[in-house]
């Protein structure tokens, strides 16, 4: 069949059906969402949990959610902007920060359900493949599925850094090593040492050293926030190690105290009857004084 030109006549517009709003806005991939949301028919009311990862210009958002007719229900959330509390003050959108955010989400969720002591995950970070297994006589491992949204799932993407952090934190998420940094598509081999370097930001440390030697002005421009916070290339690994330990020690979110808003009044308050009478008396007295001055 050859190419058929679409004739946009009255019948075309009469029968035209618009796509879903979030598809029109380019926010939701409904083909993927349908498969992530629909639960097995023999599991009845059991929610199908998703680990949602979104990377913005200044933040990394990680959430555990499940779908309901009225909308998605968020069970737990963690953000990269919480990392300064654990000592990571700069580079809040790199691979190492994504790993920390995923780890924070996992530890916070397990703490919420009282499973943090049962499923501790992988405490020593090696970068190698690790899968959580259910413990006999205890509740099963918390299972969820990665929701990367419209992100291109290329090898080394930050989304997989958050995934690795969550798995090392004790969540059971189906995955393989094919999308982690260190996987070679030609030889089909995975090098966990390369992955470990990315988790501890050693790829950034190497680039910092290289740029400092070659072009100091470019280094000062690109790593201005690192210089401002006194973060050197040699300190990065220790910073992230301390952050991982701090997250495991206390993953609980601290609520900020609510600020009392002082109400501002933009119009004048109504006068009482006494005030109105007094105002009239003052105006009358002022008018009479002015008259007397004019006469004299």
Curated annotation (Swiss-Prot):
Superkingdom of the source species: Eukaryota
Gene3D superfamilies with a match to the protein in the record: 3.30.420.100
HAMAP family xref list: Ribosomal_uL18_A
Protein family per UniProt: Belongs to the universal ribosomal protein uL18 family.
Protein source organism: Xenopus laevis (African clawed frog)
Gene this protein is translated from: rpl5-b
Record function comment: Component of the ribosome, a large ribonucleoprotein complex responsible for the synthesis of proteins in the cell. The small ribosomal subunit (SSU) binds messenger RNAs (mRNAs) and translates the encoded message by selecting cognate aminoacyl-transfer RNA (tRNA) molecules. The large subunit (LSU) contains the ribosomal catalytic site termed the peptidyl transferase center (PTC), which catalyzes the formation of peptide bonds, thereby polymerizing the amino acids delivered by tRNAs into a polypeptide chain.
Residue ranges with Basic residues bias: 255-268
Any one of the GO BP annotations: translation
GO MF terms, alphabetically ordered: 5S rRNA binding; structural constituent of ribosome
Chief localization: cytoplasm
Organism phylogeny: Eukaryota, Metazoa, Chordata, Craniata, Vertebrata
Alphabetically ordered keywords of this record: Cytoplasm, Nucleus, Ribonucleoprotein, Ribosomal protein, RNA-binding, rRNA-binding
Location(s), subcellular: Cytoplasm; Nucleus, Nucleolus
GO CC terms in record: cytosolic large ribosomal subunit; nucleolus
Protein name: Large ribosomal subunit protein uL18B
